[in-house]
């Protein structure tokens, strides 16, 4: 007698084991929704980006005009652009929440899954950066010039890499063309990495809020967690359309509505809001090479989390000192984001330097030392 098609068909069997019969801990909270929300954001970005690419022209004399043409002349082009631009912001909000949940509940202990996730985050950052340049507004142009020029700080090969990246000695037509190619390609790499991340996650099993072994109490993904994820989908789509329809420019830089001009730069050059924390860390180091190293380390430090973990408990749920350390890190992240949006002058420079030092100290010394102290308090 044949079983259900979802269990017999070779393709449906894979989907069934991933989205239907997957056994999960029965006590997962709303913080576990962000993985599926990231998947929804990625699909939305790929679909809207595909339609935008049909009307966009990757040429410095036409890029700004083609972006304007999409909003003015293409049917629902304004909606596509607003959803795509604000979808990127929601993508990063979900990603930061997802990373925060991993840090708080011990997801960083699953080394392969965590490392693939950090690589995914890096590729997403690159995708957003090259996409920001495509509008060819004044802030986009100077962000591409200033941020890419930082690579020249790399000894020996830095200048060569920048010239290859720019396609010449300055940001020009070749730069825009290759950035458009990268921006079109990277989302599919992100999708592939997301599948690899899922494979590792299903191999190691999901953690849970209390950090205990959940093999004795599992629930199937469908219908319990599909329903829960659907609630998250509705909330995310509602938030996206509120932004896209009512406040489409709330998270955009006004300088980007001015066409790019190599002879005129904005009074304060800054990236999009979701990169401001790293930009603040970059600015807090007076040396160019040191700033670039700090900028890269701000993300790469996440790779150290599984190696620096000293706790005997997986989750922070029953560890008040680790909870306090985590929320200090979150507060530091918000302070750095605020500092990144401020001009380079006192007292913002000093606050940025203190927050940057605290950011790295919490990752490298704070969490391991606090976890060791809690081990002694609880288990000795």
From Swiss-Prot:
Keywords: Electron transport, Heme, Iron, Membrane, Metal-binding, Mitochondrion, Mitochondrion inner membrane, Respiratory chain, Transmembrane, Transmembrane helix, Transport, Ubiquinone. It is found in: Mitochondrion inner membrane. The keyword Oxidoreductase does not apply. Heme b b566 binds at residue 98. GO terms for cellular component: mitochondrial inner membrane; respiratory chain complex III. Binds 2 heme b groups non-covalently. It holds the Pfam family Cytochrom_B_C. It comes from the Eukaryota. GO terms for biological process: mitochondrial electron transport, ubiquinol to cytochrome c. It is a multi-pass membrane protein. Heme b b562 binds at residues 84, 183. InterPro entries: Cyt_b/b6_C, Cyt_b/b6_C_sf, Cyt_b/b6_N, Cytb/b6-like_sf, Cytochrome_b, Cytochrome_b_C_euk/bac, Cytochrome_b_N_euk/bac, Di-haem_cyt_TM. Its cofactor is heme b. The chain crosses the membrane at residues 34-54, 78-99, 114-134, 179-199, 227-247, 289-309, 321-341, 348-369. Signal peptide: none annotated. Belongs to the cytochrome b family. The main subunits of complex b-c1 are: cytochrome b, cytochrome c1 and the Rieske protein. Heme 1 (or BL or b562) is low-potential and absorbs at about 562 nm, and heme 2 (or BH or b566) is high-potential and absorbs at about 566 nm. Component of the ubiquinol-cytochrome c reductase complex (complex III or cytochrome b-c1 complex) that is part of the mitochondrial respiratory chain. The b-c1 complex mediates electron transfer from ubiquinol to cytochrome c. Contributes to the generation of a proton gradient across the mitochondrial membrane that is then used for ATP synthesis. This is Cytochrome b. It comes from Paracentrotus lividus.
